[in-house]
Amino acid sequence: MGDPVSSKRKSSVSDAVSTSKRQHQQVKVEDVNVPLSSREHSPGPQLHTQQSYYGNGTDGASESALTQSRNNNGATSVVAISDATQNGEDSSNISNNSNAVSKGKAVVNAGHRPVTSCTHCRQHKIKCNASEKFPAPCSRCERMGLHCEIDPQFRPKKGSQLQSLRNDVDELKVKIEYLTRNESLIAKALKQSNIGQNLLQAIKSVDFSYRVAGPTQGQVAKNKISVQTYLTNEPQLLQDSQTTTTNPTTSSNSKVVTPTGSDHSPASHNGGSLSSGKPQLLNDSVPANTKDRLPPVLQIALKRLSQQISSSSPQNSSPTTTGHSPANDLSSSKQHVVATTNAMPLLPSPHANIDEFVLGDVHISIEKATELHNIFVARFLPYFPIMQSNSATELYSQSQLLFWTVILTASLSDPEPTLYNKLSSLIKQLAIETCWIRTPRSTHISQALLILCNWPLPNQKVLDDCSYRFVGLAKSLSFQLGLHRGKFMTEFTRTQTSLPEAEKWRTRTWLGIFFAEQLWASILGLPPTSQTDYLIEKARLGDDGELPPILRKLICLANFQGKLCNVMGTSVVSPDGLMDARERAGSLAILERELERLDVKLKFQEDAAVEIYFLYIKLMICCFAFLPETPTEDQTKYVTEAYLCATKIITLLTKLLETQQLIELPIYIRHSATYSALILFKLYLTPLLLDKYVDSARQSIVTVHRLYRNQLTAWAASVENDISRTASVLEKLNFVLVTHPEVFIEEEGIISRMRSHLTGTLFYDLVWCVHEARRRQMDPNYDAEAAKRNKEKWFKNRRKLYPLPFYNQISKEDFETITQTTPGGTTVTTLVPTKSAIKQAKQLAQSQGDQNGPVTHINGIPLSMLDETGSVNIEGLLANANLNLSNEHSTVLASSSSTATRLNADNPTTDTNKFNVQTVFTHNIKKSSKSSDTPTNKPKFNSTSSIPTATPTSEQRAAHNTKTSASILTGDPNSLFSMNNSLQANIQLNKTLSADSNGTSNNNIPNSTAPLNTPDTNSFNSLTRSPDAPSYGNMNVFYNAANQGTNMNTLYSQSVPNAPQGISAPLSAQPVNVTNIPNGNVNSELDDFFLRQSAGWIEGNSSNDDFLGWFDMNMAPEF
């Protein structure tokens, strides 16, 4: 300033400070109050002191002295007393003042440094420049708008200000709780006076629906309010540099309340323009079109730096509301908030007006979010009860990652995977940013990761699945948060202790981590690392009465599972970690008895999901017995046990699918079914399985394949996960049965190739067979002599291994499906040739010169193969061929040798959604001639063929309690028997196969890739018998007719002498000469068909066998 008084004041303070540095004695003086003139007041720092430092003056008096004064408002001020010239006083006044000071009590305080920092900077222990900028405030007080003062008497408060705030909050909570408990008494007291009644009426008239969270609370929101979760790195290609520069994104978990009714919604500015037309990129991929891309950490630092430079005002630390901002200024005025991943405080009011939630380009209305939230709580959470939630808004306020994870999981119940596909990559990116870039401090983050582990994100290969990494991350975070120490959580965290029932849900989350770690270790064949602790033991012993029964049982099974793996697979004396082969049987017997006692105690069969996992643990015991070098006698006694457990798992899964979709079930149920199918496939290959179980084992494998392929069409076509991967593995294994079946049985034992993946060895062993078969097929230098020796060994000890009848290898244009549910709950699916297929078969017979020849092929598919599997309904074939049977004598010819699939005529099903096969061909088949044939007097089936066919009326359908599959009813061409593997190659093969038989026949092959949208299973039997056995009497009719040259109608009428012309007797009434059947042709046609089918695997699918993700395009060829 230019004021001379101020200059002298500043000079006096400087002299006093400089003088103090040369003195070793300090004299404390009494207070001398000197009032200041108004012109001497300034906003600068005010000095409070009781210490005066004397220089080396001749008369012992200082040129200036510091005294203390107090203004009228009670605020302490610091002033300086100048010399006589400054105050307009004479030297006598100065002398008097000096004498007054000298009368004070002197105290020697050698070496004490004077106070030069203001009180605010001293409280926060930060650097202060108050003495340098005097009389102006220090830099921090000027920036923060604080009152800057220097007070030597000020002492920083002991303790943390945060603790003081906590105490205030606790006090407010107590008062609110008190008022809540006495609300009725307060209301009664208010009603007794007129003023109180007026007050109550005024409160009721206040409308809180328009109150919005934020600093502008109480404003009316005219537009729709959305809350958005921002990502630091959007899973998209980078946009134009200008767009990225002008609209920088912020870190995740930022919450901004903005109106989305305008064109400037946050979603349109986050991560650049969404309308640029560039394809989306997965979140963990690196854009290929960028050369100057910085690492994410540097991007965040650069964006924050640019924001600090360009911003002249500080960012708010609370959500902002821009509901009243002009639309054109919205993007520039909106401030993105950099927040931590702490549990966010609850929204201030249950009536907070949030209309939608935004993540990336996904917008979900509050109604949709509430619907999905309720679906998750009702249909998903009971399988894994580790959390609770009352509303979508409350869940979002607790954790944004948990909220979006719940929305993603609940969207599995949607008929279309549109929302699921959009959210999956975004949530993966959000989880990475939330957990890796910063350290979460909330239990909700661990809960979100556990949900993602139980309902995994889409993945194509085993190593692409990040669920196991999510488990490890949740476990490490939970250790840091003290979830493993229960009631001692206050020693690890303070923010989580105030949550409702914090200890209860933290403990359940820890139990969920223990279970998930054991589960995923067994899925991947890795040793578990979790150790049993106090909380696990407490849950296992049932000491926690509030623990849900399903969670306690799963914890008990997981604990036993860990013990099993530790006993059998952690040996330090063997390189593979396995117990000595000669000692396995004894240890497994002890563990098996312990598991049985556990079953008797906990009754696992009371819950279908728990029973499935219990049977899966039993299969793990069997798998340890099947590992290499285990004596054959020890393996034999576990073969039947493994078969019974696996088939029961598949039966229980079928029952669960009556009320839920397969993709809605948690991974521990789906993996149990997958493991059952794989172990049944292995058992089918070994002669140790009893012959009476072979048919049912094959049926169960096909059932799993059908269930896995017959998801909703849209889901099966666009979502890749463990379900599609398992179905693909089964199909590849089926092709190996055709091309190189010797691969499976070259070595003795059930599991012979792999050994170091614990119970996961089963999966890796089968995948090895797939790769080995491909190598032999594709390698031109394969040792022919070795192949010859292997084949001789295989033919010497072989067991005829028929391929499995997977429906997606058969054209839907040639066969329709009908289904029936038996009283035991087994669903049986039967193939019925379409009218167009029969027509083509007749044309084929005519072209071969046999006008009355039998139908032996349906579009190149030998009926012998279908009859072996029990998949074809011969009577339906005859009905479509106008070989009408009488209503009195016709019977259902369902070749079923297994008890599980035998139809029970005495107890027909009442389920209107299933077929009653016994009524399909035995009712309303009237005697008719060609002239009187009409669609109304005989049953027809809807066909997806290009040739139009008549359909029965709805009354007929209801009367017969029949129903065709959903794809046939809707005419959906993308549903049945579509080629999953190398569609075009299989189409070409079918055409070639048909052309070899008939050069002029038409082939109606579908151009679809999606499987059937029905959870039907397949019925088949007598698969290991040769087609010349008496059980194939249905097909013998055709072969006898082919050998004897008889007419089919004549053949059937011969068995009923009194029957009129055109009425056929039951097929079973015709005696069959087994010796006349062309056995060699049947076998060759069956094998030839599958060999031709397998060519699609060899030629067109060379890149689809890497189920594990072992291979990389950049790997050298020798690898």
From Swiss-Prot:
It is found in: Nucleus. Disulfide bonds: none annotated. Residues 1-70, 86-105, 236-290, 306-335, 894-913, 926-962, 994-1018 are annotated as: Disordered. One of its GO terms (biological process) is DNA-templated transcription. SUPFAM superfamilies: Zn2/Cys6 DNA-binding domain. The keyword Cytoplasm does not apply. Residues 118-148 bind DNA. Keywords: DNA-binding, Metal-binding, Nucleus, Transcription, Transcription regulation, Zinc. Residues 243-260, 306-322, 943-954 have a biased composition (Low complexity). Residues 47-70, 261-288, 323-335, 902-913, 931-942 have a biased composition (Polar residues). GO terms for molecular function: DNA-binding transcription factor activity, RNA polymerase II-specific; transcription cis-regulatory region binding; zinc ion binding. One of its GO terms (cellular component) is nucleus. It comes from the Eukaryota. Pfam families: Fungal_trans, Zn_clus. The keyword Transcription applies. Putative transcription factor. Suppresses the lethal phenotype of RPM2 deletion. This is Putative transcription factor SEF1. It comes from Kluyveromyces lactis (strain ATCC 8585 / CBS 2359 / DSM 70799 / NBRC 1267 / NRRL Y-1140 / WM37).
